[in-house]
Amino acid sequence: MHHSGPLLKRRGGQNREGIMADNTNDKLPAKDTTVMEPVIDKHYQLIETKRAEEIIERAMNLAREQIPKGKVATYIPELGKMDPHQLGICLYPLKGDKICLGDYDTRFTIQSVSKVIMLIVALEVCGLKAVFRKVGMEPSGEAFDSLVELDVSNSKPYNPLINSGALAVCGLLLPEVSFQDMIRYTRNVCSDMGIELNEAVFDSEMKACSRNRSIAYLLESKGIITTDVEDTLRFYTKMCSMNVTAESLANLGKKLANDGVCNIDGKRYMSSRTARIAKTLMLTCGMYDGSGTFAIKVGIPTKSGVGGGLLSVSDKRAGIGVFGPALDAQGNSIAGCKLLREISNELRLNLFYDPEWDKEDAEETVLKDMQARSVM
């Protein structure tokens, strides 16, 4: 079992401070009272908060136009009851005021965004080698609940941000931590003591989890899951059924952006290495089989969930949380992705920012490049 000093507190274990310590009675980090500090973009040009708000408002209006093209998730009956027209965002810069617009404080279930939290805790409690013995680090190119890679002899899940990989991570975590440990840590890292298990969604998901159950038993047959399969499945489903807000996710994103440290109270919530691994996998694998397109067009490490949530990290700059339950064909928030693309371009948050992308779509740019090469 991996140990990394004062960060850890194992289940039922020592009375030492750690990421799993019971801090539910701690005060939330003090509100950032800085007035009109600038948002800092990739090129360190100063953008006043008021201007950033105007940019995000315009982006929200453009994003809302995409909502009719999406649909809420219906394979989980409770999620099918969500209002597809909701849209909210919270952008929390390391320097400057938190910007919250729309339905940013509406509670929704975290769903697959929780895979980032599972990965963080697994890396801290079990260690890098133990985690990546169970799962890979590669994009899958398949749907989030795909069984394809598991059909290959001696294979393991491609990465921890798809269902099979997250189930494998849960099997690794379950002997060490309980769900109560996990929800406690989630409240702390999201600076949101209002996070609770949504029992109705949990029950609905457990009744509709035939595919995840198949994945879990297949993982057991390969020796990847060694804990009780049904216990592992319940643990995983509970993690997906926690109620959060866009603001909760922005709080988490901000700590990831600052390499695991809250810049207000100075508390470390994960090691810098864990934060780096999480951000890297979010960029390459966080949007399922839409990850490559999203990385090119938006260029911000992001993890999506079928509840409509998006957790985004602009490294060293800001955490972003988005809520928009109308989904595209890949199961990602259709308005949320458009919103992130717009603000990524306008605020220069794209890791690979290219001003030409402001002028024309990626497909046209690539086509022109190919035509230019053929002429030459």
Predicted regions and their residues:
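Short Gly/Pro-enriched turn/cap motifs at secondary-structure boundaries
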Residues: 79-82, 157-159, 207, 299-303, ...
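Active-site SXXK
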Residues: 96, 109-132, 252, 320
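A short, well-structured edge-of-sheet supersecondary motif
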Residues: 64-101, 311-312
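Structured C-terminal helix/loop/strand segments within mature extracytoplasmic catalytic/sensor domains
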Residues: 28-45, 60, 259-291, 295-376
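Active-site-adjacent helix/loop patches that line small-molecule binding or acyl-intermediate pockets
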Residues: 35-70, 122-239
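Short, Lys/Arg-enriched N-terminal segments with co-localized hydrophobic residues
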Residues: 4-19
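Penicillin-binding protein/beta-lactamase superfamily catalytic region
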Residues: 206, 217-277, 330-333
